[in-house]
């Protein structure tokens, strides 16, 4: 009788554990496709998509009325002070990101990055980055090719 109760309790516990939504931990939480829907970097209309893989990224950005441009490179995610993670990286042309970002908060669906007085908020893209964005993006070979924003910012790159 006691053994039967233990088996029922064990079976119920297994069902409960397998039915819960898995909460990803860093760095796995970062992996995937993201869209930047809010930035304090510029007043210009921007559209930024980024894919984070295990140690590399691909970034698609459109500033103002311009075309999408695609950048790629590598990144690192390291534990920082106060339990925050620090996100930094380098473009494929060897240029480091404009700043290191503190990951202020992150869930499976939202991520807030900050560097100094710049804050960017990303939401996870379900279904991947739109194909029209990928297909229309011009590859950028160097920082000099990064383009010019409508507000005059030269070589503006997100991240």
PLM feature spans:
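N-terminal hydrophobic targeting signals that begin at the initiator methionine
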Residues: 1-4, 21
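N-terminal helix-cap/turn-to-beta initiation motif at the start of protein domains
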Residues: 21-35
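Contiguous, well-ordered beta-strand patches that form the walls/edges
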Residues: 40-45, 58-117
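Edge beta-strand at a domain terminus
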Residues: 71-80, 114-159
